[in-house]
Amino acid sequence: MEELFNGQLSFADIEAEQFLQIRRTHADRRVNAMDRLTDDVINELIQLCLPLYHIKANHGRPYTRLETMVRVHLLQVSLNLSDLEMESYLASDMVARSFCRVSSTHQFISDSTILRFRHFIEQHRLAQKLLERTVSLAAEAGACSFEMVAADGTFIEAPSSTKNKAHARDPEMASGKKANTWHFGMKEHIAACSESGIIYGTVAAPANEHDITHLGDLLKGLEKMVFLDSGYIGCAKRAEIQEIPFKDVSWYIAAKPSAWKKELSISENFGGELGQALVECVNVKRQLEHAKASVRCSIEWSFLWLKRIYGYAKVRYRGLAKNHSRALTLFALYNCYRLRKWCAPPELSC
């Protein structure tokens, strides 16, 4: 069995709790990331890794405890640090060492150890399993019913420079256009429950592939109301969507901006009672579109956490698989955060 961490720290770590309280009052971003990594998500990943992780090293460098490596990996992903940056962070910050169960008297975790554990996560597809586990926990808690969902995609930028050894860009990335702006990189397509924000479906693809082509990979067939933006117009007629065994599904797709301009111009050209009736009709449609957007906006919060709070607006590695594995881990952490908010008792207001 794996040895347990007894919690005993060195004299250099005695003041860690005091420093932690001071930094928490000053809104330290890294301390906030540690506070979000609760024991439940750490234990879930430990249980997934335990049957596959080596327990004892017969020769060579002594093995690193599984709990320590899980904490280091999740903290590294949450802070969007490279392997070398994470090694330096553990060496210089006693609060991080205390969180990761690493004492100053022990050997520091090297960047190669962090690298190998990340490859271990990618090889066994543990990030996908962690996301599926969070979805099942949310379904048990009643936070994810798959009835009212929203789907969308977002760009993850990649380096467009060719000043490297191969004199070429990443062959798995591509260029895509949005709002007259070109982006080089990949896209993360997700589907989430509109009520709780729990993400249950993800697909990674190059940036030049349209969002509508991956909608069939996100839906399960249990959905009853699907909220989409104007880029998904006509999705119900596609062959891959018709093959999904929906029981009774309704599509709520946003109207194109050009339709709004046309209706406004027509209503402005008419006067009298007819013009007033057209204006009222346009206002009713505006309210309907606003209602659909208010439901669809729940999926935008996941992109806010992915790209701004977790800082994953640019890819870390070459290729889709490694970057998608990192995004899956972040989506699983976001699901745990949303599930805690869902299960928390409502705050009383005076």
Where would I find each of the regions flagged by the language model?
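Short, well-ordered loop/turn and helix-capping segments at boundaries between secondary-structure elements
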Residues: 92, 123, 224, 304, ...
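Polybasic low-complexity intrinsically disordered regions
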Residues: 67, 78, 84, 88-91, ...
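Helix-centered, glycine/charged polyanion-binding patches within enzymatic domains
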Residues: 224, 230-321, 325
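Short helix-capping/linker segments at secondary-structure and domain boundaries
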Residues: 79-84, 198, 309-315, 335-347
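Charged, often Cys/His-bearing segments associated with DNA-binding zinc-finger transcription factors
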Residues: 1-47, 342-346, 350
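A short glycine/small-residue-enriched secondary-structure motif
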Residues: 44-54, 61-69, 87-98, 104-113
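Basic, short loop/linker segments at the boundary and entry of helix-turn-helix/winged-helix-like folds
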Residues: 27-79
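Structural motif
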Residues: 58-67, 178-181, 318-327
